[in-house]
């Protein structure tokens, strides 16, 4: 917090269960950026309180805690995390605030943590069905932060912003791994 304060950022300690405290901390703000992570008690319940506080304070714009793949056209019920975001989206879209969702695909840093898409430990690359050539969106944290900052400053920001630092398919990942690593995948 000290580094933020040195840069001129005003830091407020608030009770996140209190819409009134959130509202008081949001007075005079042009945009609230929600960067929450969690399950229903966070993505829906807590984020609703943050949104309600922003609305009570007269904040005109809100960026929700999406920062994920675009779930709008995905089948409800297939992914819990997308379903939580979809439920919050219904709520925010029923309010008067101008909302933006940033859809950045996956954060690029997951490629270094032995996830199903790239598991260096098990020497495996995963994909669904016949999707080995399907290019996935990945965005770095820095790019996500930069685009989010731009949206926060833009009165005409779109409802949904799609971004990606790069797109890569499982077959492209395999080719890159083979080139960089002599072991077999």
PLM feature spans:
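Cofactor-binding loops of NAD(P)H-dependent oxidoreductases
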Residues: 14
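Short acidic/polar active-site loop segments enriched in Thr and Asp
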Residues: 60
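Oxidoreductase cofactor-interface core, primarily capturing Rossmann-like NAD(P)-dependent enzymes
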Residues: 1-6, 17-20, 25, 39-42, ...
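Short, structured active-site "lid" loops
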Residues: 9
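N-terminal Rossmann-like NAD(P) cofactor-binding module of classical short-chain dehydrogenase/reductase
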Residues: 26-35, 63
